Structure formats: structure tokens, C-alpha cells
Amino acid sequence: MARGIFITATGTDIGKTYVTALIIKRLRETNINCGYYKAALSGAERRDGKLIAGDANYVYNIANIKGDPNDAVSYIFQQAVSPHLAAKLNNVEISMERIKKDFYSIKNKYDYITVEGSGGIVCPISTGKEKIMLDNIIKIFKLPAIVVADAGLGTINSTILTLQYMKEKNISVKMILLNNYNHEDIIHIENKRYLSDNLLIPVYTCNKNANKLEIPVEKLIEIYEEI
């Protein structure tokens, strides 16, 4: 049976895709068969008449995953807006049935599956015939989560608000990862200390422009759960 984790963040452009790629890369470098999936992607590039799922393409390149990155994403939109709005603009009905079908197809190819969210944790995926929020996807696949947060000013507030929402939705958070961390920045140091001291969740860091995570592989493996 495969094991999975969901990667979400405290907001947009926090570094979810970057961290997701480094996690998968770390596992694959130790011969762990880890794959990637994303339900909906906005802001895709168009090349030679074809939309390119940029996030998936980045992850595949960094983590050395073979195959077409577009196959790892159920819905790909060019407009850089929330998935529900992109679907409206393109007259597309987003279906949980398709998301489930694609997810299980990817899951069956790997021993570990890393699922990346869209934007922050409160993200409408569909407001059409089916009302789908990001947390619905996390819960239907029974995935635990990693929360990616920026290491800088304001992260205590945004991280705790994100965790409170996830607690209300009964989503298990296994790790907080502070991105763009600078070991000489007093704000970053204090944010890590405060969150570590006041939350019952492990807090790790990822240095800015790092090409690998310093988190032990054993710790990463522990947070993936059977799905």
C-alpha cells in the first residue's frame, strides 16, 4: 500500500512547489519510489499551442521523475487566478470523480505520493456544480499534511491561523517547514523558536536557494501515512 503526504502553505508564493520538489528529490535520491500529484494548477505557460503545468514540470526536473509532468495534474489553466475562477473563465466543470481517478492512477505507480495544494489552505477548487474546497481533497484521500510558511515577519500569525483552520477541518499536520530561512536573521531565529516552543508539531527550516533539504530522510519517511 502506498504512503502519502499533502503539502500546503500559509499563502500563495510561499514556496510550496520548491519545497515539494526538494522533499521528493530527497526521497528519490535514497531509492524511494516517490511521485507527485496536483489537482488543479493555474498560471500555466503555453508552448507550441500546449499548456505546460509549470509547477509539475519544475518538480519533475528537480526530483528527476520520468514521464510527462502534465499527467500529474488533473486541471491545467493558463490564467494565474484561483482554480475555481480559472475554471469559470474556461467554462470547465471540475469534478471530484476525475480528481480521484487521476490521483489513484498516479498513486498506483509509486510507493510514496506527494500531493501539492493550490495557494494556501483555504482555496476554492470548484464553485460550479460541485463545490470543492482544497480541504475536501485532503480529507477524501485521508492525507496528513506539511505546512510551508515563510520564515520572515508575520509568519507566527499566518502559521497559527492556518493550523487553527486545519484543526477545525480535522486535518493532521505532521510538520511545519519555514522556507527562505536565514540562520543569521534574528526574526527568523525567533519565529522558529516561538513556533517550536508553542506548538506540538516539529518545525524545520529550508535555507533560501537551497538545492537540498537538511531534514533526515528517516524523519520524512515517518510523516508519510498509508493511504
Swiss-Prot record:
Compartment(s) where it occurs, according to its Swiss-Prot or TrEMBL record: Cytoplasm
Pfam families xref list: AAA_26
MF GO annotations: ATP binding; dethiobiotin synthase activity; magnesium ion binding
Binding site for substrate: 42
Essential cofactor(s): Mg(2+)
Binding residues annotated for ATP, in chain numbering: 13-18, 55, 116-119, 179-180
Protein keywords: ATP-binding, Biotin biosynthesis, Cytoplasm, Ligase, Magnesium, Metal-binding, Nucleotide-binding
Disulfide-bonded cysteines: none
The family this protein is said to belong to: Belongs to the dethiobiotin synthetase family.
Subunit (UniProt): Homodimer.
Its job: Catalyzes a mechanistically unusual reaction, the ATP-dependent insertion of CO2 between the N7 and N8 nitrogen atoms of 7,8-diaminopelargonic acid (DAPA, also called 7,8-diammoniononanoate) to form a ureido ring.
Protein name: ATP-dependent dethiobiotin synthetase BioD
Highest classification ranks of the organism: Bacteria, Bacillati, Bacillota, Clostridia, Eubacteriales
